[in-house]
């Protein structure tokens, strides 16, 4: 994770699971009914405990559940939905790659790591470009999860703009235009890899709204 961090002891149960995960909101019924998804939800809740999104101020857990929900409602398989729940757990949360593989297996772990940024790249634009290429090379399943993630990200940014107005850029540490450029490049990569992506229409509609906001500021 980027920036200064402090290691604090966390309360765990006899299995080494973070007890704070039990304080998270109950998962949606469709997640709770699947042992695999329920386990992934608990891991995500632990990894993102107390985290909030810079864009809209919502609990970070809401974002990963939104990504998983988009995938589930579009009819994608349980493996993809599971990776959707955990896609930020290593990059932005406290879950290690080793524990992820141990708890969820190689397939889900590989998908999550394909969606994880290289935080050794300091430049925002270069880091995002490297991520897009990494996802592209990882194949259609990773690209699909990435598309759902971008749709949730843009939704969150638009909610943040509605809530915080021009303060949103200070909260994010970058400009709305910079984020829109990344999202546009992401959509181009998604459509080059998967010309008929189920998420393309919604992504284009949300990008148009961001463009209107950016244009109105200049």
Language-model features: locations:
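Active-site helical microenvironments for divalent-metal-assisted chemistry
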Residues: 2-218
């Amino acid at each position: 994770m980027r920036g200064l961090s402090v290691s604090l002891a966390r309360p765990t149960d006899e299995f080494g699971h973070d007890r704070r995960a039990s304080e998270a909101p109950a998962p949606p019924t469709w997640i709770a009914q699947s042992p695999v998804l329920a386990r992934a939800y608990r891991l995500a809740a632990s990894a993102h405990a107390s985290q909030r999104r810079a864009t809209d101020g919502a609990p970070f857990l809401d974002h990963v559940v939104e990504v998983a929900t988009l995938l589930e409602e579009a009819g994608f398989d349980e493996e993809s939905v599971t990776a959707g729940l955990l896609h930020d757990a290593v990059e932005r949360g406290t879950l290690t790659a080793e524990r992820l593989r141990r708890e969820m297996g190689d397939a889900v772990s590989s998908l999550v790591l394909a969606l994880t940024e290289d935080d050794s790249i300091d430049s925002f634009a270069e880091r995002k470009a490297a991520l897009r290429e990494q996802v592209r090379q990882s194949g259609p399943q990773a690209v699909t999860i990435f598309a759902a993630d971008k749709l949730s990200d843009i939704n969150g940014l638009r909610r943040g703009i509605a809530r915080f107005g021009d303060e949103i850029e200070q909260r994010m540490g970058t400009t709305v235009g910079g984020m829109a450029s990344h999202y546009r490049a992401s959509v181009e990569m998604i459509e080059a890899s998967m010309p008929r992506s189920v998420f393309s229409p919604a992504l284009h509609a949300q990008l148009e709204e961001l463009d209107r906001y950016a244009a109105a500021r200049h």
